[in-house]
Amino acid sequence: MARFLFTCWSFPGHVFQPMAIAHVLRERGHQCAFYSGPRAARTVEGENFPFFPSDKAEEDAMYDFMFAPEQTRTVNWRTMLQFSSTIQRWLLGSIPQQVRDLERIAAGWHPDVVVTEQNMWAPMLVLHEKQHIPVAVLGYISCFVPGPDAPLFGLGLPAPRNWYTRLLTRSVWLGTAPFRAGYRRSANEIRRRYNLPPLRTSVLEFTGTMPLYLVMGTSEFDYERKDLPRSVKYVGACLWDKLRHERPSDWLEELPKDQPWVHASEGTVHVVSPFVLSAAARGLANLPMQVILTTGGNREPSELDLGPIAPNVHVVRWVSHTELLPRLAVMITTGGSATVQTTLRAGVPLIVIPTDWDKPDIARRVVETGAGVSLTPAQCTPQRLRAAVEHVLSTPSFRQNAQRMAAAFARYGGPPAAADLLERLAAGRIPA
């Protein structure tokens, strides 16, 4: 049996999806362990997996600059330089500590394969060559390896399907070349410390040279790309069902069944004002629908100033998506990958208000599949959100396209398919 070391950041969504794969591997007799920030310890150890924590001071510093309210978390032409600096500090500045940690773990635990999320670069840039350990990459919902079939990730740009969008993609690619060159220079400086040769491609292109790149999503949601290396495999949604750890949402049974149900969530981690929940509470008040608002794991409903709460609006900290989604008419979300995949897998249309990081790109994909609409945070007023909800409810094509995406997700194997490929990698049968 093989040993698989999963390395990921300690954000909840980054832990939960690898966890689904680890459970399948363990059921097949393999050993799995996790390397992440101390904030992930409770989740990982609660599932009885060995846990190797990264440095707490480094994690605290990363959370401070990643989630500070004034931090730049979205990219446009005005914020490009600051956003690039933030990403460089996060992805490249953390590599030396990761290497020290992972070398120590490798010496004691002896993993056969390191399975790393696409945003943790030390295993790909250093460990794979220095320790001669096979590395598999985990992509959340889409593939970051650049190519002509997809826009540059981070800007929420449309897919290059016609002359205009192809020209736009090419122009952005050329305009951002200095930033990519800066990343590569910094990566090569790090590689030089470990006596590794310099990269000849961008860092993201280099990630596609790993022996296996698993995308926890579908090709249909990722523009059906034909430009990816053979190592890239779409395995479908890898979602960890935590229902057995939580109390059932019995109160849902008391809600009227003859009205559409609308759910609004700002995700597990939300550091700005609850503007989506506030717009939903005000804009959907007293309409012929049931509105379920969840505040997330780090906020109590009583802490939020959402204004007067109408009888048809229900504010809770958490609700089981397993129980809620089969009854849902519309999902309102800030665009986290797990929420979007869970919703599409259930065939429910979305309204996405993308807030930061990869969410504008996820929102763009939702719109291009026809499974929902997108509003910018500035557009998320009570009036516009109400109009968006009424538009989605009254337009059958949104649900039809969401159901089409659900059928696409059903064609993929999910965690068992990912486990199959990882077993092949551990056995030396990848690349074929």
Predicted regions and their residues:
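Conserved nucleotide-sugar donor-binding subdomain of glycosyltransferases
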Residues: 68-123, 166, 170-204, 208-209
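C-terminal amphipathic helix plus adjacent low-complexity
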Residues: 109, 382-432
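Donor-nucleotide binding loops and adjacent catalytic segments primarily
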Residues: 217-330
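A donor-sugar binding/catalytic signature common to diverse glycosyltransferases
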Residues: 22, 116, 317-364
